């Protein structure tokens, strides 16, 4: 089966993957007067008097906006907001299927940061959270930062933080398999876009000390010319040994390789140059930085990728549904670092020590334990850090 052609055929059949379904029915005059006028005036007045009651008297408490400007849709690039709608609809389906969260796609016709921020802020009263999706770097960093400053509901860019949470969960267990720790591992991240930067920050929050980031111009180091603000920040926080050069130079003697970059950029020789017990996560999709079988043949001890046809699939669906479920359940004002760290540990801990192996470092995408475990851990962290309302 050609999955691409079959998917196109199905989308023509479905005519969209979402629909609006009522939670109550209006079949007679009494039901009409309760659901709409005149009875609906009472919940309106209650919310006017107490804004927080919007969470109790409407569906807002379970609603997330899934928002894109169409500028970085999958690996397709800037294809426009309308062309991004199938992805946003798909994301909304995953929210519902994996965590019972009602999500609504919003594809916005602007590339202007302030206009996008203003638009999202103005509609935030209808939702319990904002999930940013497929917004190009470096604009995505600025959009998220500005929204977090003004919104009183969680703002979460899944391409950054969902990826980081799941990568970290996989790495926590991979390092257990090879007898290493976050604190001592030498980590290389190839790809310094939204995902790469977020992974780097998250791993440092989990204890990584020796981290090197590489982009298409080579190893990122302090004082390097032409760095954007995100790369400038990372240049000050990473590369403690002040290494310069290429990806091959970075990988020599490394314990961990994480790829969020481009197909085929890693060779067998690069993997072979890593330390014994190397963990290799080539996650470019659909074609990874190096084929998992090649990485294993070159000496990698543990390999994970973004592909479902290999063991250890590192998939965001393990993170974002449960993270938002937990945030909504405690009515969080933010999704902070402690909540993301809690999510990583919750995912990792679902793999019992007696099950853990090089072939099984992370739960399967359809493991029904994942969403509830992540939600519980995230809500607990939210309450402990003071961002929960209930």
List PLM regions with ranges.
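Rossmann-like adenosine-cofactor binding region
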Residues: 232-301, 307-309
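Solvent-exposed alpha-helices and their adjacent loops that cap or buttress functional pockets
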Residues: 12, 55-60, 96-97, 122-124, ...
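General beta-strand structural signal in soluble alpha/beta enzymes
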Residues: 105, 131-134, 155-158, 189, ...
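Glycine-rich phosphate/diphosphate-binding loop of Rossmann-like nucleotide-binding domains
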Residues: 74, 79-99, 157, 161, ...
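Short, ordered loop/turn segments at secondary-structure junctions
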Residues: 69-71, 79, 108-109, 134-140, ...
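N-terminal ligand-binding/catalytic initiation module
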Residues: 1-155, 375, 381, 385-389
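Adenosine-phosphate binding glycine-rich loop
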Residues: 158-159, 178-181, 282-390
């Amino acid at each position: 089966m050609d999955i691409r052609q079959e998917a196109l055929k199905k989308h023509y059949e479905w005519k969209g993957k979402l629909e609006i379904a009522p939670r109550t029915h209006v079949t007679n005059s009494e039901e009409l007067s309760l659901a709409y006028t005149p009875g609906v005036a009472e919940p309106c007045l209650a919310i006017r008097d107490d804004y927080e009651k919007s969470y109790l008297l409407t569906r807002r408490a379970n609603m997330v906006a899934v928002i894109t400007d169409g500028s970085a849709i999958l690996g397709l690039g800037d294809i426009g907001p309308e062309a991004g709608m199938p992805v946003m609809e798909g994301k909304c389906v995953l929210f519902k299927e994996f965590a019972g969260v009602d999500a609504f796609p919003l594809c916005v016709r602007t590339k202007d940061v302030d206009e996008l921020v203003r638009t999202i802020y103005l509609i935030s009263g209808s939702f319990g959270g904002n999930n940013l999706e497929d917004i190009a770097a470096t604009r995505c960093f600025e959009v998220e930062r500005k929204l977090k400053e003004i919104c009183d509901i969680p703002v979460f860019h899944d391409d950054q933080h969902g990826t980081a949470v799941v990568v970290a969960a996989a790495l926590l267990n991979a390092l257990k398999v090879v007898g290493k720790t976050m604190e001592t591992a030498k980590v290389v991240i190839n790809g310094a876009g939204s995902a790469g930067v977020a992974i780097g920050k998250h791993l440092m929050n989990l204890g990584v000390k020796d981290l090197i980031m590489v982009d298409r111009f080579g190893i990122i180091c302090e004082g390097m010319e032409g760095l954007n603000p995100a790369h400038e920040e990372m240049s000050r926080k990473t590369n403690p040994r002040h290494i310069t050069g290429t990806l091959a130079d970075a990988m020599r003697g490394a314990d961990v390789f994480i790829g969020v970059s481009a197909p085929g950029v890693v060779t067998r020789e690069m993997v072979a140059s890593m330390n014994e017990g190397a963990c290799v996560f080539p996650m470019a999709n659909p074609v990874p930085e190096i084929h998992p079988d090649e990485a294993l043949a070159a000496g990698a001890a543990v390999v994970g990728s973004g592909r479902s046809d290999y063991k250890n699939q590192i998939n965001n669906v393990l993170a974002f549904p449960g993270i938002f479920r937990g945030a909504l359940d405690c009515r969080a004002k933010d999704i902070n670092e402690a909540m993301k760290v809690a999510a990583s540990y919750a995912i990792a801990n679902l793999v019992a020590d007696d099950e853990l192996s090089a072939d099984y470092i992370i739960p399967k995408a359809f493991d029904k334990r994942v969403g509830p475990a992540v939600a519980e851990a995230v809500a607990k962290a939210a309450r402990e850090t003071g961002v929960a309302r209930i």
